[in-house]
Amino acid sequence: MDSNIAIEARHASKIYELRSKEKKSDVKFYALKDLNFEIKKGQVVGILGTNGSGKSTMSIILAGICDPDEGEIIVNGTQALIAINTGLNAQLTGLENIELKGALLGLSKKRIEEIKEGVINFAEIGDFLYQPVKKYSSGMKSRLGFSINLCLDPDIMIVDEALSVGDKGFAEKCLNKMTELKEQGKTIIFI
């Protein structure tokens, strides 16, 4: 793969087995079928489609959460998925979620402490930081998830409808940060 390419899809498909109405056999459903594309480092790309067209399936494949069933997706760099209600444990507090995400990604306790203040400042959720995430509004969850992933400094940011919730002020703050990331040569994918 060319070193200027952030993501390359080669005949990638994601297939789900659906039980037929008669429950006698499974039917193959292609959520994604034979995708071929390249996204260059530093590009900002928007992926559009109707409900059920496979956009969120693509986002979890691009993020490395699951693999395509056919073909391959090659990712050149670290990636972070920012999606509504994704990656947060509802039983834990916001602060505990910051620590958990860092630990799951293999960050040292020192590195987690270094990024914690940046997450807290960017998220602007005040005392809710010490409450279980299950008490958060969808906008607050989006703020926390976005802020955690932002402070991890990934090469590739995959934003799956995460900016569609919450207030206009925070969305503008996020878009300004995305502009900064683009200027740093980061790859950004909006879904």
Model-derived features: positions:
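Conserved structural motif at the start of ABC-family nucleotide-binding domains
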Residues: I7, Y30-L32
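The feature captures the beta-strand-to-loop junction immediately N-terminal to the Walker
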Residues: L48-T50
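Helix-to-loop junction immediately C-terminal to a conserved catalytic motif
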Residues: A63
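ABC nucleotide-binding domain "signature motif"
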Residues: D69-T78
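Conserved ABC ATPase "signature" region
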Residues: E99, R111-F128, S147
